[in-house]
Every structure is written in structure tokens, then in C-alpha cells.
Amino acid sequence: MRLTVGALLACAALGLCLAVPDKTVKWCAVSEHENTKCISFRDHMKTVLPPDGPRLACVKKTSYPDCIKAISASEADAMTLDGGWVYDAGLTPNNLKPVAAEFYGSVEHPQTYYYAVAVVKKGTDFQLNQLEGKKSCHTGLGRSAGWVIPIGLLFCKLSEPRSPLEKAVSSFFSGSCVPCADPVAFPKLCQLCPGCGCSSTQPFFGYVGAFKCLKDGGGDVAFVKHTTIFEVLPEKADRDQYELLCLDNTRKPVDQYEDCYLARIPSHAVVARKNNGKEDLIWEILKVAQEHFGKGKSKDFQLFSSPLGKDLLFKDSAFGLLRVPPRMDYRLYLGHNYVTAIRNQQEGVCPEGSIDNSPVKWCALSHLERTKCDEWSIISEGKIECESAETTEDCIEKIVNGEADAMTLDGGHAYIAGQCGLVPVMAEYYESSNCAIPSQQGIFPKGYYAVAVVKASDTSITWNNLKGKKSCHTGVDRTAGWNIPMGMLYNRINHCKFDEFFSQGCAPGYEKNSTLCDLCIGPLKCAPNNKEEYNGYTGAFRCLVEKGDVAFVKHQTVLDNTEGKNPAEWAKNLKQEDFELLCPDGTRKPVKDFASCHLAQAPNHVVVSRKEKAARVKAVLTSQETLFGGSDCTGNFCLFKSTTKDLLFRDDTKCFVKLPEGTTPEKYLGAEYMQSVGNMRKCSTSRLLEACTFHKH
């Protein structure tokens, strides 16, 4: 018995010992100097963290790849990486993600990006398109400003074969310094810095090293960030001896970097594991560290200073750190163009050499949409391919990342897509089948009306006494069902607690344990897709018929689901006069009077895509509409007809309006709608919107 008790006590003690590492964040250092700073970081954090709080430990490796592998294997937990390494860290099997971003500028105006620039000596006479045969200085192999961006720009000028990339670059320049390159396999890449040393102890490594290579090492051009020359040469007279190469093959003074840069690059990021990554612990440590050891906070230890070298653990020019939104992975953090540049380089592909006759990958939201899309793909003879996602935001993200190319969105989601960099391509048109006139005139369709519908029998309900009623919505962040009515309510109640304003409701996409999901009935309750029976226009109207007091829909919804137009059991006996509209002035009107009794006019649903894919989407969709846009669907495939309701496109679409080239989301949605959605931003629960606007402080 005594032995058993002793064993239990030992196990308990061991359990306590094993529990401690759960609160320990192991920071990975890539050099002796970094490890020395990390140890100082660790020791100083002990003095400011609570006794029961997180702890910092240091793990020393010899390179960034080794640290990335260590974090992936849980031997370490965090480190700061340049964008090029963030890409590598995000790939399988590493599966790391950004959890915090360095920012520059100031606390009031934080910048989570910097400019990649090409610096040359004043008095030389070549431009960006004349770099072949010159001597180049780079921050490091695979790094953003020093390699990924400049080589991405020069990629199609490299002689074939372009793989391995290092060999092609060796042939392009007469000599280079590319730290971290293989000096045996690619000796010309190490001509200006013998050995190509891959740590901050090497004289030509990193931003300062690349500039030193230009200044003192025989280089003709240095690829660095815009602040490098200001850090190295604080005197304007010294800086005036250098210039920037611009994309339009001109030159500008180094202080005009905002008008003369190669690319805008996301700042360095702290990365952690995607799963079980200790994100909260990491941020708790970084938050406290900034408060006590940030810029100008302490003389004993400074987070953003490197007495033993340069840019140790963090960049010395960083002003602080911001937490990255939880939805943001490495692709959203870096951006599609950046990721594509890396991928093209690694695969040895030159995009300029191909004619865009590729299929358009359409994003489908549910099993029913996927079934219709697959049918479309077959009958289109492969011009359309299909990609699936669970939610509209998942689809938008896939388009942003290049996994899909297009989908149709209502105004609310088109706003989010626009904030993520997508553009409107073609608009649905509901008035007539002659889309030529608005297309030729370059005008946008008028739009539809957002209305509030109630049962005619509930005579006491008005727009002014909706508090405590049961509400039915098409979905969170959708135009008629959410943004417009909730925006109007917000202006009245001045808070975002809509689940306290209504007693119950169904708002697909809202928090599932909320009262605004109480009325939902789908197999995947409150999901923002067709797995929720009350999703969308028809779903919200059905919610009103079966459970609710008010439904927020489009003006055609009642007309499309009454007088026998919808044969479903719940709708087949409904009459138009069974329902009325709530007017904002507190009156009610018949549903046919929507033109004089509506909440607002909404932009028509619109097809969105990435900028570089927009022309192809427009061309394919135009040809597909010619073939399958008619109304004779007997035995034929029709774009604008569905087995249920509004699959891929709205069923009442007559044709597509081609939008003028260069149409931005702001132009299409209109200033009034942009403002109303912008006002709702403080109430937004969209994780994707949060991620896409992170770099737009």
C-alpha cells in the first residue's frame, strides 16, 4: 500500500512537471548571436510575466529550414520569418501559419508591409529591363525583397530551361551575391561573396549586406527593402549618390520609393503550427514583451534591437507586432500574386508564354450546386470545371488563392470579395433578356429591392416594433437578408447585439448557439449553405411561413413562391395576399407595391474573379450564356433554372450584363451601398473579411 501511495505521489509530481511545458513557448534561433539575444529575451521576460503565466525558452538551430522543421515537429514553437520563408513554412508537411506580424511606421499608422526596391549607383546608365549581364546583390536565396520579387519580374527573361532556377539566374547576371545559395553547384551566385554565407554574421547577408555588396563589393544593383538605404545612410547627401529602378524603366531618387518599387511585400511574420500551435501563449508573451521591451521602453533589453548583429529574432526597423486574424493562412498573408510568383519560379513556368485557353473553375456551395455544376461541366465540353466549398466565404477564399476562378455573389459577399482583391466581371440581369443595351452603354443594372415581409394576419407588426419578434434572414453578410435591414437597425439601436433585439430567428452563418439560430431546421443547422433549409431567399420566406414573424428578402421572393409557382408542400397553397411589406415609415403595403415600400435598393448579384482571370471568365461565360442561357429547359441544360432554387445563379436571371473593363467593386456596388456595408463592419462576424483587410490598417 505504501508503495502504491508513493507511486501515486511520484506520478502526481511527474504530472505537474509535465504540465509546465504546456505553458512554455520555445523560440527558435538560427545563429549563436540570435540564441544569445533569445536567452536575454527569456531572462527579461521572467521579470515581467506572472508566476503562473507563460514561459519562454530558446532552441538553437543552424538555419531557417531547420527551425521550420523543428516547429513542425513540436521541438520548437515560434520564430520570425521573411515572406519567402513564410511560404515554405506553410507548405505540407510543415503546415505552419502566421500568428503575428511585424509593423513599421507608428502605433497610430502601423504598416504591415514594405516595398521591395532595386537600388543602383547614380551615374550608371541602365534601366530595369537592361539588367542582363550586370552584377546583382541579393538579401538571400528565397527571400522576398532580395530574391522572390526581382527574380519573379525577370523570370520570363531568363534563358530556358528555367529549372533549376539558380542556374538560369547564374546565366542571366555576370556575377552575383546570393547568400544561402550552393557555392559548389552555382559558383557564379557566390562570385561577389565567396561561400554565400547564410547567417547574419556574414558581411553580405540580409538587407544591409546586399547594400554593402552594391556599395563596396562590386555589385551593380541591390535588391532590398525601401528603408535599407535610410538605415545605412542617414545623411541625405550620401543617399543622393543612389537611385531606384522603376517598373516603367525609369529612375527616381531613393526617397520616392512609393512611386518606384518592384512590389509591396507583407512584413515579416511570427509563425507557429497550424494545429496545437500555442497561438494564445505566443501572443501573450509578445504582447507583454512589447509593453515592457518595445521601442523606447527599456534600456536593459530591446525587442527590436540587435547589439550583436542585425535583425536578430525580429527586424530592427520593426515598431511593434500585431496579432494576425485567426483565418489567415500563409496564402492569405502573402497574397495570390506573391504565392504565384514563388510557385511559378519553383515549377520553372513562364506565364507570359501561354495563351489563356484554360477552363474556368466554378465554385459550388452544396451537393445540389455541385450536381448542377458537374452537369454544366460535361455539356460545356470541359470549358467549365467545378470546385466545391462549404460556405460562400470558403469559395471566395478558394478564388483568392487560385483554387477556383469564379462564382456569383450577392452584394454583401461581393463587398467581402472586393476587400479580398476580387473584381466584378458580369452582373445578373432580371428585367429582360436583352442585356445588349446596358452592356453597350456601359451602365450597371438597376438592382433589386430589399424588403421586410410579414404575414397579413399579424396586423400589429410594423417596422417600428420589431423588437422581440422572430426574424428570418437569407444569411449573415448577405444584402437583402442582413446588411440592409441590420444596418438600418444598427442606426437605431447603436449596438450589434441583434440576437438580443430579436427573441429568436434563423440567420444562417450566425453563431450556432445564438437565439438567431433557434428557428433553423437544416441537417446542418444554421449553416450558410443549402444544408440549412431556411438558407437563402426561399429559405427565409419558408422560415416566415412556418415559424417567424418577419422575413428579410428580395422583392420578388413572395411573388416567386405564391399562387402555385412553388410546388413544394409548404408553399403550394400560399396566396400573395397572405403577406404584406413593412415600410420604413411604419406603414404596411401589399407585396406588389415594393417600389414604394422597401428598405433599400440592392445591387444585382455579380460574377467575381481574380483580376488576371477576369477576361477569361467573361469570354467563357459569354459563350456559355449563348448556348445555355435560354428559357427552353425541357430536356436541356439551363444556366438559370434549378432543381430547387437559385443554384449557381438566381433563377429569375434573364441574361448577363458585361461590366465595363476596369469596373471596381466600389464602382459596381455604389457609394451608398459601400457606406452602408462599411458602417456594418463593426458588427461583422466575417473572419475572411478580417483576414483580407489586415494589411489595410
Swiss-Prot record:
Entry binding sites for hydrogencarbonate 2: T474, R478, A480, G481
Domain of life (superkingdom): Eukaryota
Record GO terms (molecular function): enzyme binding; ferric iron binding; ferrous iron binding; iron chaperone activity; transferrin receptor binding; transmembrane transporter binding
Modified residues (Dimethylated arginine): R42
Iron recorded as keyword: yes
InterPro entries found in the cross-reference section: Serotransferrin_mammal, Transferrin, Transferrin-like_dom, Transferrin_Fe_BS
Broad class of where this protein is predominantly found: secreted
Keyword Iron set for record: yes
This protein's UniProt keywords: Disulfide bond, Glycoprotein, Ion transport, Iron, Iron transport, Metal-binding, Methylation, Phosphoprotein, Repeat, Secreted, Signal, Transport
List of glycosylated residues: N513
Modified residues annotated as Phosphoserine in this record: S388, S684
Annotated Fe(3+) 2 binding sites: D410, Y448, Y537, H605
UniProt: Fe(3+) 1 binding residues: D82, Y114, Y207, H268
Location of the Transferrin-like domain: 25-347, 360-682
GO CC, one annotated term: cell surface
Expression by tissue: Expressed by the liver and secreted in plasma.
Binding site for hydrogencarbonate 1: T139, R143, A145, G146
Disulphide-bridged cysteine pairs: C28-C67, C38-C58, C137-C213, C156-C350, C177-C193, C180-C196, C190-C198, C246-C260, C363-C395, C373-C386, C420-C692, C435-C655, C472-C543, C496-C683, C506-C520, C517-C526, C583-C597, C633-C638
Subcellular location(s) of the protein: Secreted
Subunit details: Monomer. Part of a complex composed of SLC40A1/ferroportin, TF/transferrin and HEPH/hephaestin that transfers iron from cells to transferrin.
Alphabetized PANTHER family for the sequence: SEROTRANSFERRIN, TRANSFERRIN
Protein's job: Transferrins are iron binding transport proteins which can bind two Fe(3+) ions in association with the binding of an anion, usually bicarbonate. It is responsible for the transport of iron from sites of absorption and heme degradation to those of storage and utilization. Serum transferrin may also have a further role in stimulating cell proliferation.
Protein name: Serotransferrin
Organism annotation: Mus musculus (Mouse)
Originating gene: Tf
